[in-house]
């Protein structure tokens, strides 16, 4: 560990430096966010309105119902042609939702998602050394409202997805002090529900967090074992075949597949991109992202290390739909934190650089045949825009470019410039080492 580094856990408790003007700005942005969520795509628009979908939540419910009824889980669609793509352990968890009506599930699930988003933001401030006082909670509530218009968050709520819960589980678990005996159990459970979080094992390995790594792997193995014990046939089918069936997920060249494979498929205009290209660029992205995570961890920036790992996992995953990128939430919080401690006004550009491109910008394709009952198809997120050919590279892979910017910024600030975060709220300027 660099002797000049300041660990987040070692920073005396700070106070959020948000005055009247700051609250006014946050309040205006929060109101604008709510209006955009409700009316940019009119909330009563069939299928596309914020309260008119929840397809994935219904799939979760029906997957749980299939388990309760003792029927095969992976032999065919569980709802409207939709396959159940999660683990047997996840299906067991979803049995709880099978007892609720669809409308009841929507209300409870949405409320819990918003509460989980608020909890993630509060935990970010906590792990960055801020006091959890009334001001921190107020700022977190306003930030939660602003982030509702972030595309990964809006789409997660719109579909009834599980991403925010997994984000909360990992941030709470791996953001804790490394001396915590059960640290790693949350990451193991998250991987047991959805395999992508297993990527955090690589982060624990390169940062030599052996106890957390072992705990995560053992916990994951326990979730697999539970699946075999309770629904053996489904577990056997999943782990011996269904797991690698990419056709159950979706087309690789879908615009909303914001991963390396999706970007290559889009740029080469093919649903089956070259495996060699995908492997090479995925490996490069993994090295870049994990390298940034390692540098952040080495310089005591644990939350930044976790965030870079989460962004890297979504980048290199074969399928990373827009709603998987919920790690933009801690990224923007981190950018705001670094702007506050840098004491330079221009640093406040950073949170907006990371936030604006990932908002739920939408456009309309006038084609009545696309969605029965409506006269338009509403694409959400910059990646759904149909740009001229010369603008395809910056738009179709916009989330990957945000990841790249975050990784390079981390390497430059903490790897090259050796940025030293002030250890208190003292007005001393932030310095860098040559």
For each of these PLM feature ranges, what is it?
Residues 187-204, 316-327:
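Transmembrane helices and adjacent periplasmic/lumenal helix-loop junctions
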Residues 119-123, 168-176, 204, 330-344, ...:
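Transmembrane alpha-helices and membrane-interface helical segments
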Residues 2-183, 207-322, 378-395, 414-434:
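Primarily membrane-embedded glycan-assembly and transfer machineries that use lipid-linked glycans
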Residues 73-83, 167, 191-199, 244-248, ...:
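Juxtamembrane/interfacial segments around transmembrane helices
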Residues 184-187, 234-241, 326-330, 345-352, ...:
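A cytosolic-side transmembrane-helix exit/cap motif
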Residues 301, 305, 320-328, 338, ...:
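Short amphipathic alpha-helix initiation/capping segments at coil-to-helix junctions
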Residues 162-171, 195-198, 215, 325-333, ...:
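Hydrophobic core segments of transmembrane alpha-helices in multi-pass, intramembrane catalytic enzymes
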Residues 40, 336-434:
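Aromatic-enriched
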């Amino acid at each position: 560990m660099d002797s000049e580094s300041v660990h987040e856990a070692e920073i005396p408790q700070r106070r959020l430096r948000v005055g009247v003007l700051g609250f006014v700005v946050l309040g205006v942005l929060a109101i604008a966010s709510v209006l955009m969520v409700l009316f940019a795509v009119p909330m009563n628009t069939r299928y596309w309105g914020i309260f008119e979908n929840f397809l994935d939540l219904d799939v979760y419910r029906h997957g749980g119902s299939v388990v309760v009824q003792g029927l095969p889980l992976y032999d065919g669609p569980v709802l409207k042609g939709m396959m159940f793509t999660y683990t047997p352990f996840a299906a067991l968890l979803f049995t709880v939702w099978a007892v609720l009506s669809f409308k009841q599930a929507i209300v409870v699930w949405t409320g819990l998602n918003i509460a989980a988003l608020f909890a993630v933001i509060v935990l970010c401030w906590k792990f960055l050394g801020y006091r959890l006082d009334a001001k921190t909670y107020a700022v977190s509530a306003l930030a939660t409202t602003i982030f509702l218009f972030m595309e990964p968050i809006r789409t997660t709520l719109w579909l009834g997805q599980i991403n925010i819960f997994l984000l909360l589980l990992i941030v709470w678990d791996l953001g804790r002090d490394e001396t915590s005996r059960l640290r790693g159990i949350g990451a193991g459970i998250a991987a047991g529900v959805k395999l992508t979080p297993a990527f955090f094992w690589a982060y624990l390995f390169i940062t030599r967090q052996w106890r957390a790594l072992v705990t995560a792997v053992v916990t994951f193995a326990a979730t697999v074992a539970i699946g075999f014990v309770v629904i053996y046939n489904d577990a056997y089918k999943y782990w011996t075949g269904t797991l690698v069936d990419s056709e159950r997920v979706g087309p690789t060249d879908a615009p909303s597949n914001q991963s390396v494979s999706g970007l290559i498929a889009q740029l080469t205009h093919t649903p089956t991109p070259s495996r060699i290209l995908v492997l090479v660029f995925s490996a490069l992205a993994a090295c870049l992202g994990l390298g940034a995570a390692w540098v952040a961890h080495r310089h005591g920036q644990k939350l930044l290390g976790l965030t870079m790992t989460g962004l890297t996992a979504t980048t290199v995953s074969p399928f990373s739909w827009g709603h998987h990128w919920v790690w933009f939430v801690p990224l923007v919080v981190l950018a705001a934190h670094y702007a506050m401690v840098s004491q330079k006004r221009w640093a406040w550009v950073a949170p907006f650089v990371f936030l604006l491109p990932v908002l739920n910008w939408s456009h309309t394709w006038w084609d009545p045949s696309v969605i029965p009952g409506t006269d338009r198809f509403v694409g959400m997120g910059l990646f759904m825009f149909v740009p001229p050919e010369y603008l395809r590279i910056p738009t179709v892979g916009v989330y990957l470019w945000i990841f790249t910017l975050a990784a390079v910024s981390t390497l430059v600030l903490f790897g090259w410039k050796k940025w030293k975060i002030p250890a208190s709220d003292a007005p001393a300027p932030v310095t860098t080492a040559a």
